[in-house]
Design a protein with these regions (language model features):
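Catalytic cysteine-centered active-site loop
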Residues: 1-42
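Aromatic- and glycine-rich peptidoglycan recognition patches
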Residues: 31-37, 57, 63-118
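Short glycine/proline-centered loop/turn elements that form peptide/ligand docking sites
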Residues: 41, 54-56
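Structural motif
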Residues: 45-46
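Generic marker of residues within folded, mature protein domains
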Residues: 50-52, 95
Length: 118
């Protein structure tokens, strides 16, 4: 299962429908200001987006305290589902790679069908 499919499944399990692809999920969310040194505004359940300045290519689910769950491939990841951290103290190669590609974060505040979440 790829990263955006994992996010879609996680939200669907709670009755919340979000778009399929990472770049669509990024556009769908309410932006949350985030950087590697400033994680204070992130809440558990927020989506974290990674990629190049031009395009979102990866998405993860924030668990709290800068940790996130994601599904990543063999080239830049764990070849499956894992948990990594945005904190600089986490020197694992996977965490370092994705930290270098951090684009931002977003909060899901409605379903894809337009239903507002409370």
């Amino acid at each position: 299962m790829d990263c955006s499919g994992l996010m879609q499944l996680a939200f669907a399990s709670q009755g919340i429908w979000i778009p399929r692809d990472a770049y669509q999920q990024e556009r769908f969310c309410q932006p949350v200001a985030v950087s590697v040194g400033a994680l204070d505004l992130l809440r558990p359940g927020d989506l974290i987006f990674f990629g190049s300045p031009r395009r979102c290519t990866h998405v993860a689910l924030h668990l709290g305290s800068g940790r996130y769950r994601h599904s990543s491939g063999q080239q830049h990841g764990r070849n499956g589902i894992g948990v990594d951290s945005l904190h600089l103290a986490d020197r694992h190669p996977v965490a370092s790679h994705y930290r270098s590609e951090l684009r931002g974060a977003g909060r899901v505040i409605r379903c894809h069908d337009g239903t507002t979440l409370s």
